[in-house]
């Protein structure tokens, strides 16, 4: 009995142990799901912070590039600016509150007040609608610019009216948010009330809004892109026919697509495709909560519907700045200019401290422009190897002639001697050559250019100095060391010219040479 009792007691306790194990398993699974949900919540918060910073920087750079450069037409620039402005507003209004709600759904109780919730939802709807409606406006402008490149189908006034219509449409489509409290939008899926009201008005509003503001604009964009592609493919035959006939016809409008147009088409198509792919979780959530009336939705689906649609806010400026070659060149050039300007400031600031230690010409110039000019002049008028050799020969010949003059002076003092007279120079030789200056002792007369520190308003440029007077790159005729030497230089007289008549009645001119 004891044994039987001991055998029965374990069997009797098995149901209790099984129920406890099941409860422990349920608790472990609940804790595991809660931990995974918290981890995914942290991931979504981090991603939204990155999207917030990148979207603001990217859209501001798009605005700067469209305002600074004239790469695109004024109408295209206006539509791109409108898209960038809506992205900035959506980032400032939508993302911060969703970051707070994703971090902790029960923090910041003032967010759940009815008035604040309605205002935030209204702004969410407006900026989301403006972003979506800007796509067909850009596609329409591209369609007209490709099919009619020499005409302006959309003027500046019409483009302004179209932008005003986009904002009016967005405001009208977002006004019912004040009447329907539990409305989810594409950027913020948190609702103003915890319990969903399964009213007919809510269902009608969701259907009308998504058809008129989301589905139809996306379909229009694809329709315009298909028409552009079809027109460009059909235009090749027209170009061949007109080129063969050599008779241009005014009635035929040949579509034109440059590299810039192709880049804009690729950018627009990429933006729309990214928007559609990122909106799939939001559409799934709307179908679950509105059409299928499923009250309990997965936390992962809700968080994915919160952060994934916001990727389009970051993708739009990134695609615009990277796909377009002209915009990319402008951006890179601006960054290079900023880098050069910053590096120059650093050089000037470090050079001011070095001026006290070393008295170099480039540091004492006092102006960065004069310093750069002085360096450029040195590079331009730097003598080549041939010029250095000719200059060395010229200096050697000048020293030899000076020694001859000095020896003849000594011989003249000792006694008169007859020396052969040198042949007279011609006029051309006298102009191209200058009498060499007498050698001067460096101790007696120091170099007058030794105190010059660089080219300034009261200094001679380097091409006028005596060291470079024989250079081929000089800007002035060769001069002596001083203006007095040029004045004292005498041009020898040319002998009388004789004219003789030949048998063919040709006049020959022979200069008279002293025998």
Curated annotation (Swiss-Prot):
Top-level division of the source organism's lineage: Eukaryota
PROSITE patterns named among the record's database cross-references: G_PROTEIN_RECEP_F1_2 (PS50262)
Transmembrane feature ranges: 43-63, 83-103, 119-139, 161-181, 208-228, 268-288, 300-320
InterPro entries: GPCR_176_Rhodpsn_7TM, GPCR_Rhodpsn, GPCR_Rhodpsn_7TM
An example Gene Ontology CC term for this record: plasma membrane
Extracellular side: 1-42, 104-118, 182-207, 289-299
Keyword Transmembrane helix: yes
Protein's recorded name: G-protein coupled receptor 176
The species this protein was found in: Homo sapiens
Organism ancestry: Eukaryota, Metazoa, Chordata, Craniata, Vertebrata
Gene designation: GPR176
């Amino acid at each position: 009995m004891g044994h039987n009792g001991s055998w029965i007691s374990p069997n009797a306790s098995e149901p209790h142990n099984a129920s406890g194990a099941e409860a422990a398993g349920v608790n472990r699974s609940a804790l595991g799901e809660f931990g995974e949900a918290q981890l995914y919540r942290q991931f979504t918060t981090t991603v939204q912070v990155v999207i917030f910073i990148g979207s603001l920087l990217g859209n501001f750079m798009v605005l700067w590039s469209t305002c600074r450069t004239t790469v695109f037409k004024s109408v295209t620039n206006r539509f791109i600016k409108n898209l960038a402005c809506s992205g900035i507003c959506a980032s400032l209004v939508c993302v911060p509150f969703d970051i707070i709600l994703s971090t902790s759904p029960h923090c910041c109780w003032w967010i759940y007040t009815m008035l604040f919730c309605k205002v935030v939802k209204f702004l969410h709807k407006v900026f989301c609608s403006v972003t979506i409606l800007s796509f067909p406006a850009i596609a329409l402008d591209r369609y007209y610019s490709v099919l009619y490149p020499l005409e302006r189908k959309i003027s500046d006034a019409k483009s302004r009216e179209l932008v005003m219509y986009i904002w009016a449409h967005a405001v009208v489509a977002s006004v019912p948010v004040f009447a329907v409290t539990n409305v989810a939008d594409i950027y913020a899926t948190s609702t103003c009330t915890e319990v969903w009201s399964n009213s007919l008005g809510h269902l009608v509003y969701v259907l009308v809004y998504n058809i008129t503001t989301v589905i139809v604009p996306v379909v229009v964009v694809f329709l315009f892109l298909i028409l552009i592609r079809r027109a460009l493919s059909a235009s090749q035959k027209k170009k061949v026919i007109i080129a063969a006939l050599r008779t241009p016809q005014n009635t035929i409008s040949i579509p034109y697509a440059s590299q810039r147009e192709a880049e804009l088409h690729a950018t627009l198509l990429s933006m729309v495709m990214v928007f559609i792919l990122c909106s799939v979780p939001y559409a799934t959530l709307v179908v679950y909560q509105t059409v299928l009336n499923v009250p309990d939705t997965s936390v992962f689906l809700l968080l994915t519907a919160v952060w994934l649609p916001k990727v389009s806010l970051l993708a739009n400026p990134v695609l615009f700045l990277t796909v377009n070659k002209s915009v990319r060149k402008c951006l890179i050039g601006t960054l290079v200019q900023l880098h050069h300007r910053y590096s120059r400031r650093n050089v000037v600031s470090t050079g001011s401290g070095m001026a006290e230690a070393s008295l170099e010409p480039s540091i004492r110039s006092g102006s960065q422009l004069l310093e750069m000019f002085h360096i450029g002049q040195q590079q331009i008028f730097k003598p080549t190897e041939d010029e250095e050799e000719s200059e060395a020969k010229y200096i050697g010949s000048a020293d030899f002639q000076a020694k001859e003059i000095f020896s003849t002076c000594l011989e003249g003092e000792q006694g008169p001697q007859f020396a052969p007279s040198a042949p007279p120079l011609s006029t051309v030789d006298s102009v191209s050559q200058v009498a060499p200056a007498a050698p001067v002792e460096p101790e007696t007369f120091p170099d007058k250019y030794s105190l010059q520190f660089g080219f300034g308003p009261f200094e001679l440029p380097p091409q006028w100095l005596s060291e470079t007077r024989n250079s081929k790159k000089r800007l002035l005729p060769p001069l002596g060391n001083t203006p007095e030497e040029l004045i004292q230089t005498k041009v020898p007289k040319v002998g009388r010219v004789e004219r003789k008549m030949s048998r063919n009645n040709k006049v020959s001119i022979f200069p008279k040479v002293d025998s």
